[in-house]
Each structure stands twice: as C-alpha cells, then as structure tokens.
Amino acid sequence: STKNIFQIISNEQSQIGSLHKNLEFYVEINSLNNTISKNKNSNQTIIEIPLHRFSKNDLVQPTFLIGENLLDCHLYLTYSRWLSRSHWNQRLPSKLNAILIPGGGDTTEKLLNHLSQDGRYFSLCLTDSDIKYPGGNIGETTKKCQKLTLKEISHHLTIPVRASENLLSPEQIHQVLNIDHTRNILLNNLKKITRFRNTDAWLYFPLKEGIRPIIGPHQKNSRDEYWQITAYANDSLENEFLYPGISTDLLKWTVDYLKNYDPEKIKDSNLISAWTKISTTVIAWTCASEPIRA
C-alpha cells in the first residue's frame, strides 16, 4: 500500500541520515521548480530536479556508468564499494548500482554525449588520461569528453593515470600474479618496476607492455627524456626491455581475482589520492536504495 511505501522511505531516511553531507554530488527534489538546475554549495554540487520529472521511471533507473571497457567499469565499482567500507569506514545503508556501458575510442564520447542530450537518465563517464609521462598531453578520448557541454544529470571524470592498470598497487598486482603459478614468472618483472611506486612514474608507466630501447637514429622527445630511453644502433637489443611490463591481461586477471577476494590495502599516497577522487564520485552517482516492494 501507499502507507507502507512511505513507512519504508521514512525508515530508510533515518538510516541514511546526513550521508548526503559527505557526497560531492547529490540530488534534491524540488516541487516548485520546473526545470533541472545545478548549484554549487561550498565543495558540493547540488542537482535540483522538479518533482514532476519523476512521474516517469527514467530518473529512478540505475545510473549509466560509461567506461572505456567493461573491465574498467567493474574495477571502479568494486574498489568504490570496498573503499566506502574499509578505508574511510563510511557506512552505506544503500548499495552501488549502475548499468555498465563499454565505450572505447570515439564510442565513449558519443555515448556520453547521447545520454546527456537525451536527458532522461543519470550518466557518469570515467576515462583515463592516457598521459605517457608527467606533463604530457591527455589522450584523444578524454580530450573529446572534456569538450562536451553536458546537461545537469551527466558527469565526466578524468582519471589522472595512463590507464586503469596504473591504479593497482604493487601489492595488488603481486596477489593477482601469485594466485596462479603460470603467472609467477611475471613476479620478477613486478620487482623490477616496483622502484617507481609512490611516484608520478607509477601513474604513467606502461604496465601492460613495458618500455623497450629505441633502435636506430631517433630524435629524443619529452617522453624519452623522462623515462631515460636510449637509442641503440644494435638491433640485437630489439627484444630487450629497459623496464619490463606485466601483461596485457593484467586488468582481466585483476577483475577476476576481485570476484573472490577483497582488494589489497592501498598504502601509497598517490594511489590513495586517485582512488579517493574516483570512489567519492562513483559513490555519489551510483548509490541506490534497494527496490521497494510493499
């Protein structure tokens, strides 16, 4: 009955309490306004939505979470759920709920633009920077997303790392490799690049492919200078690594691992900073109550 529904909402509200005060974004339903508006209040963004917009079910559907692929989306949601209850002991009486949408290349920007202009659903898009070294240029996908004029119920976040793999700590990668004996050989590669931990270099290192020497004549650029890449005339070094990578399957292995195990505790300040930004945004845009079945 209607009475039971309101009782459930009332009980839930008392549980949630002042949770919204800890969120970067939250929605207020306003019976007086006719249009959706967005306002800044100190360090929070408040999206005001008129009551009549809820006469249809569109805005009560889960947020569309757009990533460059589904593995990225799963990683962001899994870590955000875990961080909300472990690192900051934030009690979430609600769950994180989203419809995961894989983008990739130009598709990411087109999906975000379509959902935003459609204006019926909440949408959140996360893209990595694709920056190759500190001070380098952001990638084309993120650049295009940043140029979009988004409506109030859509949001884009640029993640300050080269790729989502760079959000993984050395401890997390070690556990993912150690659980399968066929990957143990890669632990030595991890040991060689752990020297970069808790530095800007870890955020931009090509974890999937590593860094090879340059063979033949080459005009050094800023990337080469940063990673101290040397050009060699001897092509016998073509298959050698200056710094080895881990694997192009690292993200897939990690997402599979996290289906059965909690993430490893994050120790490095640069990763804590990156994950704090990601998780506070994801929590604000995807936290949702359980469906009411009165």
Model-derived features: where do they sit?
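Acidic, divalent-metal-binding catalytic cores of TOPRIM
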Residues: S1-A294
